UniProtKB/Swiss-Prot annotation:
One GO term of the biological process aspect: regulation of transcription by RNA polymerase II
GN (gene name): TCEANC
Residue ranges, compositional bias (Polar residues): 103-119
Protein name: Transcription elongation factor A N-terminal and central domain-containing protein
Organism of provenance: Homo sapiens
SUPFAM superfamilies with a match to the protein in the record: Conserved domain common to transcription factors TFIIS, elongin A, CRSP70, Elongation factor TFIIS domain 2, Zinc beta-ribbon
Transmembrane segments: none
Biased amino acid composition, Basic and acidic residues: 145-165
Length: 351
């Protein structure tokens, strides 16, 4: 892998670690960047300046901030040095250029100046901001069209995968989710001709789920785990059958809730639980009783009521209202047929 590829990969990894706030592994990547020879082209064609500048601004570790500041000061000197050479290059004196080439390696005073800047940490925040503004805008335009030479020689498929991973940090996670969905879809059927079909289903389902929860990665992961668990459940074989038959499209499946993905037995069980809970906590609304026109409703003052006998416990009365005498536990309960008013009176004698 060339230096440019290594720098781009390190910058992408630093961005991912900063987004996850995982500061423990940043030191290794910054140390590797110190050992790599960085040129002006590397700074312009990669995203390394923005990544290191983000470490300098957002990392809580003082040691990592010093490393980032040292790297930025070193790169600033390299950037200024290349600019000064481009301006003062002797184009009309080739003999002088040959002498310089034959003179052999010599210590450049700008390198000593760079080391001095790095050791004293005299780089101000304004200088760092200027450096990032000079280099990063050019970098953004280049990153939109990555070239194959960034990744060296290799297969076009691997090159495309690497470029997409560098551009989007969520690509490895989404690829893993597609693999999990594919494994869950093929868990019940092992037919080889359907492998491509299941692969397309897994990719479409993942795309729709990512569209729904692209702004919340936690909800995205939770939804994927729910889909995988329901697809792997042997009692939910109807989900694969509906996808194969076209009854359920991948988009509809991605939008299905946990209640909708459940099988018929589980739905009936939940309905029975709900009905039993309602019955347990349901106050008596309509009670069969004796029709009478001798009682006047206290709300509508009409004589159209029903009279019955009911236990105090049915009304969920507190213990201090109830009497310990079992003969007095029964009360006369009246329901108006006109307005629905309900009331009771414990002093009435009922036979």
């Amino acid at each position: 892998m060339s230096d440019k590829n290594q720098i781009a990969a390190r910058a992408s990894l630093i961005e991912q670690l900063m987004s996850k706030r995982n500061f423990e592994d940043l030191g290794n990547h910054l140390t590797e960047l110190e050992t790599i020879y960085v040129t002006k082209e590397h700074l312009q064609e990669t995203d390394v300046v923005r990544a290191v500048y983000r470490v300098l601004k957002n990392c809580p570790s003082v040691a990592l901030k010093k490393k980032a500041k040292c790297l930025l000061s070193k790169w600033k000197a390299v950037y200024k040095q290349t600019h000064s050479k481009a301006r003062n290059s002797p184009k009309l004196f080739p003999v002088r250029g040959n002498k310089e080439e034959n003179s052999g390696p010599s210590h450049d005073p700008s390198q000593n100046e760079t080391l001095g800047i790095c050791s004293s940490n005299s780089l101000s925040s304004q200088d760092v901001a200027k450096l990032s503004e000079m280099i990063v805008p050019e970098n953004r335009a280049i990153q939109l069209k990555p070239k194959e030479e960034h990744f060296g020689d290799g297969d076009p498929e691997s090159t495309g995968k690497r470029s997409s991973e560098l551009l989007d940090p969520t690509t490895p996670m989404r690829t893993k989710c597609i693999e999990l969905l594919y494994a869950a879809l093929t868990s019940s059927s092992t037919d080889q001709p359907k492998a491509d079909l299941w692969q397309n289903f897994a990719r479409e389902i993942e795309e729709h789920v990512f569209t729904l929860y692209s702004k919340n990665i936690k909800k995205y992961k939770t939804c994927i785990r729910s889909k995988v668990a329901n697809l792997k459940n042997p009692r939910n074989s109807h989900l694969q059958q509906n996808l194969l038959s076209g009854t359920t499209s991948p988009r509809e499946f991605a939008e299905m809730t946990v209640m909708e993905m459940a099988n018929k037995e589980l739905k009936q069980l939940r309905a029975s639980y709900t009905e039993s809970c309602i019955q347990e906590h349901y106050l008596p609304q309509v009670i069969d009783g004796t029709q009478t026109n001798k009682i006047k409703c206290r709300r509508c003052e009409k004589y159209n009521c029903k009279v019955t006998v009911i236990d105090r416990g049915t009304l969920f009365l507190p213990s201090w209202v109830r009497n310990s005498n079992p003969d007095e536990q029964m009360m006369t309960y009246v329901i108006c047929n006109e307005c629905g008013e309900q009331w009771y009176h414990s002093k009435w004698v009922c036979w």
